A protein has these predicted regions:
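A short alpha-helix/helix-coil micro-patch that ends at or immediately precedes a cysteine
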Residues: 17-76
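Surface-exposed patches in mature extracellular/periplasmic domains of secreted proteins
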Residues: 51-65, 79-90, 126-141
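Bacterial signal peptide processing site
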Residues: 10-14
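Disulfide-stabilized extracellular recognition modules
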Residues: 51, 106-157
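Short, surface-exposed glycine/acidic/tryptophan-bearing loops
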Residues: 65-115
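C-terminal motif of bacterial Sec signal peptides marking the signal peptidase cleavage site
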Residues: 5-9
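Extracytoplasmic/secreted envelope proteins and their assembly/folding machinery
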Residues: 38-46, 65, 69-72, 102, ...
Length: 157
């Protein structure tokens, strides 16, 4: 049996060309995330941040999570991870008061500890986890084969 675990390098809003930011989303999408897994990820991220004396990240169960779920569904449809249309998500959150936005994505991990450890062993993902952010939204979902896809959006308010 072959297992595929993938993480994609993170995206920070400074690296993205601006797109049209006139974007609406159904916040009910946030309800579709696997909140048990998402909460475990957030706990692990905050444990790591606290060990460094960094501020605890607050969970955003509305807009950031709705954008994250939408992106996770998009990745599931393509069967690959990516940061496509990140600037749209970033600009939409900035329209709602965020000053900076970044995201980490992954697929194939079956436990929160595994995906967070993978991100922490990647310098670009680790820099997002340790970044100057205050809130995080989650799109944690399984495809029809039971494989997990992850989008974690970080932002500073």
């Amino acid at each position: 049996m072959v297992f595929l675990f993938t993480i994609a390098s993170c995206t920070k809003d400074e690296d993205v060309v601006n797109e049209e930011a006139n974007y609406s989303i159904d916040v009910n999408l946030a309800k579709e995330t696997d909140w048990q897994m998402a909460n475990e990820i957030l706990d692990l991220v905050n444990e790591h941040r606290n060990s460094l004396g960094l501020r605890t990240i607050k969970r955003d169960q509305q807009y950031a999570s709705a954008y994250a779920v939408e992106h996770t569904k998009y990745m599931i449809g393509l069967e690959k991870i990516n940061h496509d249309n990140f600037s749209t998500r970033s600009n939409a959150l900035k329209d709602r008061g965020a000053s900076s936005v970044a995201e980490n994505v992954a697929m194939g991990y079956t436990a929160a500890e595994n995906v967070v450890n993978a991100w922490l062993h990647s310098p670009t993902h680790k820099s997002v986890i340790e970044g100057n952010y205050t809130h995080s939204g989650f799109g944690v979902m399984q495809n029809s084969k039971g494989h997990y896809y992850f989008t974690q959006i970080f932002y500073k308010k």
